[in-house]
Amino acid sequence: TPEEEQYVHMHSVTECIARIIPAERLAEADEVRDNLNYEDIFPYIYLEDGLVEFLELLAGRGIRMAVHTNRTNTTERLLRHFEIDRFFAPVVNAGSLKRPKPDPEGVHYILNAWGLPTETVAYIGDSALDERSAGAAGVTFWSYKNPALAAAMFVPDFDTLRSCLAGIAAPVPGRTAEEPDLS
């Protein structure tokens, strides 16, 4: 159903399996999952248009980027497959947290790793769980491709966001990457 599709887009694989697989088939689903070769799936996954250029713009401006996802053990492999892993640190997935999104634990972990206050960070996400996680952490939320979310900014695509951010001045000499200027 559309509701199940929306649910599995946002939640961890463990939560999704528990919701959509009948209880009497959970062991079978776990066995399939344990034996799945994700490398076979990667050719069917694609990057959003403009993503790499956007990441390069941010990196060139000294703006830090992280991943906060409800994926579990495939995130790093997926980032490496697309050769974009160099842009993100830390990478926080549901398997590394006590409480996945929408709990703010992952956002707090990123802020602590960077040593940054909430007011210097924007969280770009596409789901209600992203919106809730950012809100619970006190971080500005920008909605990607989802105008139904309550966000400080709606981003229809990465090219549009790149154009918006292109006007931000290059890093000021003496300013570190830990002090991005998003104002």
For the regions a protein language model found, what residue spans apply to each?
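Asp-based, Mg2+/Mn2+-dependent phosphohydrolase catalytic module
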Residues: 52, 56-63, 72, 76-183
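Conserved phosphate-coupling serine/threonine residues in phosphotransfer and NTP-handling enzymes
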Residues: 68-69
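N-terminal helical cap/lid subdomain that shapes the substrate entry/recognition surface
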Residues: 1-61
